[in-house]
Amino acid sequence: MNKKFIVFLSSRKSWTLPYIIFSAIFVVIPLLLIVVYAFTDDNGHLTLANFQKFFEHPEAINTFVYSIGIAIITTLICILLGYPAAWILSNSKLNRSKTMVVLFILPMWVNILVRTLATVALFDFFSVPLGEGALIFGMVYNFIPFMIYPIYNTLQKMDHSYIEAAQDLGANPVQVFFKAVLPLSMPGVMSGIMMVFMPTISTFAIAELLTMNNIK
């Protein structure tokens, strides 16, 4: 019994158990409940009335479409800014790279509402009006670390022999990037897209604070 327990503790997979339990309780189960409530009425009977009510209100549809648009723009900006940052981090010296990664991740330790209020104060200090531009800026500021880290992690683990092979075959830096680096880093890019797009499309607090109802 003791040997089995020691083997269990020494197994790497066992350390993922708390994360799996946490995800199941606070992520999977709430999502399942949302799906259940979407297709049931107050009595628990299956219905599509909830979707009918949604499509009967143009304001709700416009808000939904607008949220998708803001999420797409934010995600694209995060890719354009996050990929070069991740590339610079992955090609920096090890100690400097770790320090810079910590600096990028450090703001994530602060509550998102506090970060957003700080952004509002910054715009107010420079007398910049709140609105759509402020909203996108706040979204990018809050979620760009979620784009940088997965891309950086993928670039760090990338097999550089493919890059060397492309260079030996006469490929220029642009060709090396698009033919070797970008395809190999796509798993990190896709992870970053999911980690930015999903919270951006559903974040209400940032939109409320950075627009002050200036966008209808």
PLM segments and residue spans:
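Extracytoplasmic catalytic/substrate-binding loops of multi-pass membrane glycan-assembly enzymes
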Residues: 43-48, 213-216
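Membrane-water interface segments at the C-terminal ends of transmembrane alpha-helices
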Residues: 8-43, 56-156, 182-184, 188-204, ...
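Short, Lys/Arg-rich, polar N-terminal cytosolic tail immediately upstream
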Residues: 1-9
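Glycine/proline-centered hinge or cleavage motifs at structural transition points of membrane proteins
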Residues: 169-170, 183
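A short amphipathic helical element positioned immediately N-terminal to and/or at the very start
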Residues: 47-55
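The alpha-helix within a helix-turn-helix
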Residues: 166
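Membrane-helix/interface signature in polytopic inner-membrane proteins
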Residues: 152-162, 173
